[in-house]
Amino acid sequence: MMQPSIKPADEHSAGDIIARIGSLTHMLRDSLRELGLVQAIAEAAEAIPDARDRLYYVVQMTAQAAERALNSVEASQPHQDQMEKSAKALTQRWDDWFADPIDLADARELVTDTRQFLADVPAHTSFTNAQLLEIMMAQDFQDLTGQVIKRMMDVIQEIERQLLMVLLENIPEQESRPKRENQSLLNGPQVDTSKAGVVASQDQVDDLLDSLGF
């Protein structure tokens, strides 16, 4: 004896679920477009179990890189200031000497100070170069965070695809078909919602959502 098919107790609530899924899908589409990801991303290779932790990881790595760069700049600044101050002072003293040559003893002192400055320059520049290297190395976070963001975007793309499939499989036929037929003359060929996996382009996704009223 055949069992009667079980129908949803509240058809309106089922419709609300479909509407909410459609709205969420539309939001994801708009977000992808705003990020410049208009072209379809490759299908998800693997899911990220906890997107919140991944985002926190990206924020953490970015903050650490910024801190390393700022620390290096702050460490280098005194060395640059010292060289600038000493160079300006020596330049002024040499200008004064050429304008009015001084005694031999004072000239020797000027030469000695100049030689000391030249001897100190390599130490300052070496320290500064090390800090510049640290700033450059701090940028390696971009490779790691870029991979994480790419995986998250893949997952978002997969979620969008799955939500579209839910709409295709569950939208009431009597509600979706008239809308597609009414708009077919304006928008051209529409997506065949009777087949799975037919969403082939971004324009088709938009047309599908429009035809379903989202």
From Swiss-Prot:
Entry's Gene Ontology cellular component terms: bacterial-type flagellum; cytoplasm
Hey, which family's this protein in? Answer: Belongs to the CheZ family.
* Class in the EC hierarchy, top level: hydrolase
> Subcellular location, in the record's words?
Cytoplasm
> What are the GO BP annotations of this UniProt entry?
archaeal or bacterial-type flagellum-dependent cell motility; chemotaxis; regulation of chemotaxis
* Annotated gene: cheZ
Kindly list the organism's lineage: Bacteria, Pseudomonadati, Pseudomonadota, Gammaproteobacteria, Enterobacterales
Q: Please report the organism this UniProt entry assigns to the protein.
A: Shigella flexneri
EC? Answer: 3.1.3.-
Compositionally biased, Polar residues: which spans? 183-193
This chain's protein is named: Protein phosphatase CheZ
Q: What is the protein's quaternary organization? A: Homodimer.
